[in-house]
């Protein structure tokens, strides 16, 4: 029939053999004695033997045995022939009818082996290895597994049976691997991402501590899950390669990091001060050293040491020019009885002061006022000389006082001498006179 395989049903004769010494009968393998009829009946091994066929094989009962065939193979059963209609087949010569006292031969082994077995040279029924003899019907994609009295068609690990074919199982679809999975025919392999190593179970991945094994960083290595990062010591910054560290030039970040000068060093920096200053505890600010107070100056005995920001000045004693007379260490007076003093200021008072270079403006830097106020008198304040650059002006702040104002920033070092004149006018007694403060201004080199 088209589409079917004809499976030959083997008819096996069941011989009822008397047991020597008594009249009890015995059947060959694959048959059981029916005591009611005295006949040998076929044993259905497919029902009595647990898992007679394994895998995707189907058990087909045969007379005196059974057959394991693929489930996909259709079976056509031929006409059943009763083995008991003629207890002796044509293949076996008919035995002579027994006499009244037959002499039965002693039979220790069956003469016929059931299906799936064959008789060896010692008349023993041994299993037929269908897999070794290539007498199985397994598909080329399957493997043959021999069983007692038959065989089973199965698939190797990594394959499953689908419509009679062994198809590869894609283990990667089922998450067998923790990270990377590569499917191969009949198997799979797990791998790990960079920074991980495969554990002994072949599936899970463990982080690699690169800092402990390689220490790829120049300075500090910090392990992370699956990787690592490099860090630099204070004063260094990480380069673009993520491994090396280069010195950080802190001085380039801001011009206000140090009050005077910032000196960069590998991994750090420090502030320095110019001569005449010391660095304060904040390590950035500079403070003037008072050389005069600490007697760290070069002035001679006749000179006066005047401390400046960042230095000092050795001031000579004042010299009063004719017709002036020196009346103190810092004052010259022109006597009223001297005719040459008529148009001259009555007194010249010497004063010294210092300002830092580039001081912000406008700035009130000096105060001037009359010591005595006369009835009917008023006062005029002005810069008599020394203001050629128009960097100062006098602002009268009251009837008898005025303030010297610096209007432009002055860059040092520089020495300036201004004659500040106070004119006294008294209309009651028709008097007009003046006095001068000779102000010497020392501008330091630095703005601190």
Curated annotation (Swiss-Prot):
CDD domains for the chain: EGF_CA
GO MF annotations, alphabetized: calcium ion binding; integrin binding; protein homodimerization activity
Sites where a glycan is attached: 283, 296
Keyword Glycoprotein: yes
Residues in EGF-like domain copies: 42-82, 127-167, 168-206, 207-246, 247-287, 288-333
Chief subcellular location: secreted
Membrane-spanning segments: none
Cellular component terms (Gene Ontology): collagen-containing extracellular matrix; extracellular space
Pfam families in UniProt: cEGF, EGF_CA, Fibulin_C
Signal peptide positions (record): 1-23
Motif Cell attachment site: positions: 54-56
SUPFAM superfamilies: Growth factor receptor domain (SSF57184)
Oligomeric and partner information: Homodimer. Monomer, homodimerizes in presence of Ca(2+). Interacts with ELN. Interacts (via N-terminus) with the integrins ITGAV/ITGB3, ITGAV/ITGB5 and ITGA9/ITGB1. Interacts with FBN1 (via N-terminal domain). Forms a ternary complex with ELN and FBN1. Interacts with EFEMP2 with moderate affinity. Interacts with LOXL1.
The protein's name in its UniProt record: Fibulin-5
Native organism: Bos taurus (Bovine)
């Amino acid at each position: 029939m088209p589409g079917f395989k004809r499976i030959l049903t083997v008819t096996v004769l069941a011989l009822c053999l008397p047991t020597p010494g008594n009249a009890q009968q015995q059947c060959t393998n694959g048959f059981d004695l029916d005591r009611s009829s005295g006949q040998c009946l076929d044993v259905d091994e497919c029902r009595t033997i647990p898992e007679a066929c394994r895998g995707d094989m189907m058990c087909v009962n045969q007379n005196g045995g059974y057959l394991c065939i693929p489930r996909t193979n259709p079976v056509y059963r031929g006409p059943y022939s009763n083995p008991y209609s003629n207890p002796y087949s044509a293949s076996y010569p008919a035995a002579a009818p027994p006499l009244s006292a037959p002499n039965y031969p002693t039979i220790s082994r069956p003469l016929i082996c059931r299906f799936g077995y064959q008789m060896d040279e010692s008349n023993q029924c041994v299993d037929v290895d269908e897999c070794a003899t290539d007498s199985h019907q397994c598909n080329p994609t399957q493997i043959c597994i021999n069983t007692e009295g038959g065989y089973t068609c199965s698939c190797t690990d990594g394959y499953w049976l689908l419509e009679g074919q062994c198809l590869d199982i894609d283990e990667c679809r089922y998450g067998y691997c923790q990270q990377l999975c590569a499917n191969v025919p009949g198997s799979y392999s797990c791998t790990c991402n960079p920074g991980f190593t495969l554990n002994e179970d072949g599936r899970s991945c463990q982080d690699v501590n690169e800092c402990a094994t390689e220490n790829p960083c120049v300075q500090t290595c910090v392990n992370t899950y699956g990787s690592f990062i490099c860090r630099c010591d204070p004063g260094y910054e990480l380069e673009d390669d993520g491994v090396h560290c280069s010195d950080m030039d802190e001085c380039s970040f801001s011009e206000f990091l140090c009050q005077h000068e910032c000196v960069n060093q590998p991994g750090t920096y420090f502030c320095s001060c110019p001569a005449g200053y010391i660095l304060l505890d904040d390590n950035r600010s500079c403070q003037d050293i008072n050389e005069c107070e600490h007697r760290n100056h070069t002035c001679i005995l006749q000179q006066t040491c005047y401390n400046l920001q960042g230095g000092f000045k050795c001031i000579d004693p004042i010299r009063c020019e004719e017709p002036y007379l020196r009346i103190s260490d810092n004052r010259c007076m022109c006597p009223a009885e001297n005719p040459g003093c008529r148009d001259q200021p009555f007194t010249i008072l010497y004063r010294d002061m210092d300002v830092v270079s580039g001081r912000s403006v406008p700035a009130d830097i000096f105060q001037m006022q009359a010591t005595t106020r006369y009835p009917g008198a008023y006062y005029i304040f002005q810069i008599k000389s020394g203001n050629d650059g128009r960097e100062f002006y006098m602002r009268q702040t009251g009837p008898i006082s005025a303030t010297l104002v610096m209007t432009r920033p002055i860059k040092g070092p520089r020495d300036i001498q201004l004659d500040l004149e106070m004119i006294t006018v008294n209309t009651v007694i028709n008097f007009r006179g003046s006095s001068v403060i000779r102000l010497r201004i020392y501008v330091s080199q630095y703005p601190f």
